[in-house]
Regions:
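Short aromatic-enriched loop/helix-cap "lid" or pocket-rim segments at secondary-structure transitions
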Residues: 15-19, 155, 188-190, 217-219
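N-terminal "arm"/small-domain region of PLP-dependent enzymes with the aminotransferase-like
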Residues: 1-41, 46, 53
Length: 236
């Protein structure tokens, strides 16, 4: 048997199909009228409120559903963020040296150039990130990082590294795009907090997804952001 470690594919047999069917029928009874209307640019309000509640409980900080927009999976969020934050083809974005192939394709497809930073067991190396930021001739548009269960290395960024990343991004006035699409693939030990939960900053953008725990074919993702980035993304 051959496993493709580049793809975050959950075993389809592990999803409770019958329970999901019953839940879907209940949802239609409860939200059927709303489902027959267009929900606006941010997505269905009740679902946005539920995702905001989910993140509030996970992160331990209050998440405002007004700052949350539903996405067609996390990859739509990844792409829209890139389009919203870039100014022109050739703009730079910082990523881990090895990152998700879909993100590489999406960013190269819209003309971004990726600058890779090596990772070790604790995630992206902050000493190398700082050195690269000081050396680059032009300022990158943002830092993109898979903080937990990074694809393809599987590393999880330590809390100390997360704090250092936040401080470095603030020092160089850079937005951070935290893609936490693998955050639910967690089985033991303490979960690391999201960046926005450690030190809230309007330059932090957060991408979440249910695709690893809830019917990947539904393509349910979401983005948390504040002004002015939120408006830039929603208007795409």
């Amino acid at each position: 048997m051959i496993y493709d470690f580049a793809v975050g594919q959950t075993n389809p047999e592990t999803f409770p199909a019958e329970a999901l069917k019953r839940a879907a029928l209940r949802a239609i009874d409860l939200e059927g009228a709303a489902m027959n209307r267009y929900p606006g640019g941010k997505g269905h309000l009740a679902l946005r409120e539920l995702m905001a509640q989910r993140e509030s409980e996970r992160a331990g900080v209050s998440v405002n559903p007004a700052n949350l927009v539903l996405m067609n999976g996390s990859m739509q969020a990844v792409t829209l963020v890139g389009q919203a934050l870039m100014s022109a083809p050739g703009d730079l974005v910082i990523t881990e040296t090895y990152t998700y192939s879909g993100t590489i394709a999406a960013y190269k497809g819209i003309g971004l150039k990726l600058v890779g930073i090596l990772v070790d067991a604790g995630g992206m190396r902050m000493d190398l990130l700082e050195a690269r930021l000081k050396m680059l001739p032009v300022k990158p548009k943002f830092i993109y990082t898979l903080t937990s269960y990074q694809n393809p290395t599987g590393t999880t960024m330590s809390r100390q590294r997360r704090i250092e990343l936040i401080d470095l991004a603030a020092q160089f006035d850079l937005p951070i795009v935290e893609d936490n699409c693998y955050g639910d693939v967690h089985f033991e030990g303490e979960k690391q907090p999201s960046l926005y939960a450690i030190k809230p900053d309007p330059r932090h953008l957060y991408i979440g997804s249910l695709s690893k725990i809830f019917a990947p074919g539904v393509r349910l993702g979401y983005l948390l952001a504040e002004s002015p980035y939120f408006q830039q993304i929603v208007s795409r």
